[in-house]
């Protein structure tokens, strides 16, 4: 019996910081919009990058596990090189992996998060197999839990 089972998405998030990004403001009569820009067709140096697990199902599972709760997660992983990275991190974080849905094709969710010099973020997201989780994919008989958290 688990304390909590999370259901949601799984992604690998890559955070990229570059002071080369320009913030461009465009105003119209009714509003102003800010855009992050880089010189078109150029190679842009980055100042730093990191990768972290992301997605609502993973983020909440990690937080519950850090609080000491017996945790499992229902997420869908693709048939790619990202899938084992996420799987191993869940194991290391003491999160049960028996409810993970392993796709035989498709890509795991992936995001590139561009961080401006002001700290604002622009996210380029590929949902991958997260967008194809179906009720029939989930083994509800295996989900014995006090709580279920749908992210």
Segment roles from a protein language model:
Residues 1-72:
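Glycine-rich phosphate/adenosyl-contacting loop at the front of the ribokinase-like
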Residues 52-59, 82, 104-105, 130-135:
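Short secondary-structure boundary/capping elements
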Residues 76-78:
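Alpha-helical transmembrane segments within multi-pass membrane transporters and channels
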Residues 89-106:
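A glycine-rich helix N-cap at a beta->alpha junction
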Residues 98-103, 113-151:
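Conserved phosphate-binding/catalytic loop of the ribokinase/pfkB sugar-kinase fold
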